[in-house]
Amino acid sequence: MPRTGLSKDVILKAFQELSDALVKQNVKGELCLFGGTVMVLAYSARVSTKDVDAIFQPAAIIRDAAAQIGNERDLPPDWLNDGVKGFISAKHDVVQGNLPQFPNLRLTMPTPEYLLAMKCMASRINPAESQEGDVRDIIFLIRHLKLGNAADVMRMVAEYYPPDRIPIKAQYLVQALFEEGKI
């Protein structure tokens, strides 16, 4: 697997193969995509992502098909994973957006507000922790949503997560982005 990660083309080909596998089993599947995959597919804000974070149904069938596709395409073993499920908000706002759809595979994603809240909750700034860190994605989403100040951003995060669970590093990061003129 190249160090550049999963490009839009690689992801879409893998999703087509996943849909084809579901057709053969006469099963309809759904992936709710998160993180870098949404930034690549829906917003073209990145050229690649290290993996596809998603929650999916039917989980066992999709997991098995994804493992086979990964082996055939020389993708990382966890190219499609549900590690994000521990970060899902009780206010789970998802849309189809402009994501491509496949015959037996429906794709959804969080609203931009929800995705921004998730990115702020993670607030990964070290590229070793996340392919590019979350900072670029946070900047992109704040601009996309036309939010004018850090307080507006943090109010939005609090719509999705209890205020006492919002990491202080998220508040400092967002404040610094505005103070440094990056927004």
Enumerate the predicted regions with their spans:
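Compositionally biased terminal segments of proteins
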Residues: 1-183
